[in-house]
């Protein structure tokens, strides 16, 4: 049987069995067999092997004999731990009524009692036992004490270094509690110095020092105010809780006992007012506790019970209600009128003088259908004025003065000195006009209101043509005034000079929204302020032939003026010998 159990244990738990046997044999020579086995090895075997009692008993029987089995059984089955940590034996329940040791052995499956004299008679100083080895109860009590010492070991004596560290830890804890404000100030100053180093650099300066002190004072004051606010809030909450507890009985007395005498009611009111005066936040806390449902029972403080104490407010007079209603209606009407005027001004800017739009102020622009209809009417009323014949022109239709009507009912033409700017700015009329529908007393070649603007977005006015007789005194800035013979007077004077011609300069844009340019193809009568001048033909320059520069050109170039376009002049310092040398 032993061989079978040994083979089983070696195959299943070979590692732990080997370690346990080696540790037992090594420790037995030093401390003694029984004491060390009970104190150290038995808990290891119980916790690490298995829950099956048979395996543990067999292992102990194979390794140490029957004595170990008895000690093991007495240790883990014969005692219980109490609350105070002391060991109390329960041998009576385990051994039976007679208390015979033979019953213990029979229950453990042991047929003979081993010789325990060696356990108590050992002369080993390290394993001195204080119990009788022949008494199983004494042996079990001793084993229980050893197990209790293992589970609850006595405090270990600290070394000098451990004691010093523990004392320092406690001392620092007390110092932090006593110097809490000082630590906060030091931490705040470190943060301020770090911020100042980023702003002013690491070098000391007066500005840096002043900023550090001001910032530290500001942050310190802010922290103190925050701490005071938190402290007052905590105190007020505690006071509110205490005062509410003392105020509720008085209010409940006033609400439930309406027939109480005046003395009782007066004392309750005084107590309630005193409590409210001590804590302003008490009303808010009371509102959270009051039940405003009058349908509930009057078992506590509710709205139904307070109606007996606080009388209802009298209703407002009828004339005051009527005046308030009239005021509200007048205010609403004024707001509607203001919105109507604002929408009219936003939709129809500058067209209030047109006859077709006189009825628009009587419309309600809050309706989208009315808005669309009025806008279409304004456009329709404007287009017939533009598309009329020459006898009924746009100038007479837009005039502020009464338009004269002839005998046959037709509208007379406008006077010759009529100005469009007197009626309306051109920017407001030009987007609505069609180029083909514009008719005026004057020629269409000189007044063309066209929607086809240049791609650059710049408008150009009709430019007066340059005349040789008028512009004879004018010179371009890059010509010398003393070269009047060889210098052309204008870019249009191409017949008298071989210099290249230039297109007319564009004038800067003006405040007119449409371009007006003279029609050069068909001569027609023009405005009175613009004389009818015929333009000479523009001669294209011959790019293949280079003009020969003269001495005057060299002189003007030497004086700092640039040469005429198309000419490149190079001269030498010794002009006496090589004065006529020209560069190709």
Swiss-Prot record:
Compositionally biased region (Polar residues): 399-409, 433-453, 483-500, 511-531, 572-584
One Pfam family here: DUF3020
Record-given protein name: Uncharacterized protein C17D1.01
InterPro entries found in the cross-reference section: SPP41_DUF3020
Gene Ontology cellular component list: cytosol; nucleus
Region of interest (Disordered), residue spans: 151-188, 222-243, 399-418, 433-584
Compositionally biased tracts (Basic and acidic residues): 159-188
Compositional bias annotation for Low complexity: 231-243
């Amino acid at each position: 049987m032993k061989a079978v159990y040994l083979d089983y244990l070696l195959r299943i738990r070979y590692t732990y069995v080997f370690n346990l046997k080696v540790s037992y044999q090594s420790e037995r020579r030093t401390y003694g067999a029984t004491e060390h086995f009970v104190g150290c090895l038995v808990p290891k075997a119980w916790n690490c092997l298995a829950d099956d009692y048979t395996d543990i008993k067999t292992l102990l029987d194979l390794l140490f004999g029957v004595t170990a089995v008895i000690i093991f059984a007495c240790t883990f089955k014969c005692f219980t731990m109490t609350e105070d940590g002391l060991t109390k034996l329960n041998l009576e329940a385990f051994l039976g009524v007679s208390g015979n040791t033979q019953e213990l052995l029979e229950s453990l499956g042991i047929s003979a009692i081993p010789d325990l004299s060696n356990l108590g008679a050992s002369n080993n100083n390290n394993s001195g036992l204080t119990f009788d080895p022949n008494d199983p109860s004494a042996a079990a009590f001793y084993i229980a004490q050893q197990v209790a010492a293992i589970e609850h070991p006595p405090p270990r004596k600290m070394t000098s270094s451990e004691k010093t560290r523990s004392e320092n830890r406690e001392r620092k804890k007390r110092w932090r509690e006593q110097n809490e404000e000082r630590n906060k100030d030091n931490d705040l100053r470190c943060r301020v110095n770090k911020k100042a180093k980023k702003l002013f650099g690491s070098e000391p300066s007066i500005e840096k020092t002043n900023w550090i002190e001001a910032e530290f004072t500001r942050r310190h004051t802010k922290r103190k105010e925050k701490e005071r606010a938190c402290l007052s809030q905590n105190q007020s909450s505690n006071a509110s809780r205490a005062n509410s507890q003392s105020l509720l009985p008085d209010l409940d007395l006033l609400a439930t006992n309406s027939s109480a005498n005046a003395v009782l009611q007066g004392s309750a009111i005084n107590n309630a007012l005193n409590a409210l005066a001590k804590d302003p936040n008490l009303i808010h806390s009371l509102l959270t506790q009051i039940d405003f449902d009058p349908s509930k029972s009057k078992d506590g403080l509710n709205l139904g019970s307070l109606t007996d104490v606080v009388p209802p407010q009298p209703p407002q007079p009828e004339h005051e209600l009527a005046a308030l209603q009239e005021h509200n209606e007048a205010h609403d009407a004024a707001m509607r009128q203001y919105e109507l005027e604002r929408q009219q001004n936003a939709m129809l800017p500058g067209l209030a003088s047109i006859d077709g739009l006189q009825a628009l102020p009587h419309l309600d622009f809050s309706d989208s259908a009315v808005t669309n209809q009025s806008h279409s009417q304004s456009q329709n009323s404007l287009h017939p004025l533009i598309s009329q014949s020459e006898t009924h022109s746009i100038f007479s239709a837009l005039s502020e003065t009464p338009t004269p009507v002839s005998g046959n009912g037709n509208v007379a033409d406008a006077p010759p000195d009529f100005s469009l700017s007197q009626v309306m700015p051109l920017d407001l009329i030009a987007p609505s006009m069609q180029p083909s529908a514009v008719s005026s007393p004057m020629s269409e070649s000189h007044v063309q209101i066209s929607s086809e603007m240049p791609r650059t977005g710049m408008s150009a006015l009709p430019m007066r043509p340059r005349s040789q007789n008028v512009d004879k005194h004018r010179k371009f800035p890059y010509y010398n005034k003393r070269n009047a013979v060889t210098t052309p007077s204008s870019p249009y004077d191409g017949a008298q000079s071989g210099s290249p011609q230039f297109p007319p300069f564009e004038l800067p844009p003006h405040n007119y929204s449409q371009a007006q340019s003279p029609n050069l193809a068909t001569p027609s009568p023009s405005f009175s302020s613009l004389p009818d001048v015929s333009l000479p033909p523009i001669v294209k320059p011959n790019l293949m032939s280079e003009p020969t520069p003269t001495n005057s050109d060299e002189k003007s170039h030497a004086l700092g003026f640039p040469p005429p376009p198309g000419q490149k002049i190079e001269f030498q310092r010794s002009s006496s010998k090589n004065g006529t040398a020209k560069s190709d």
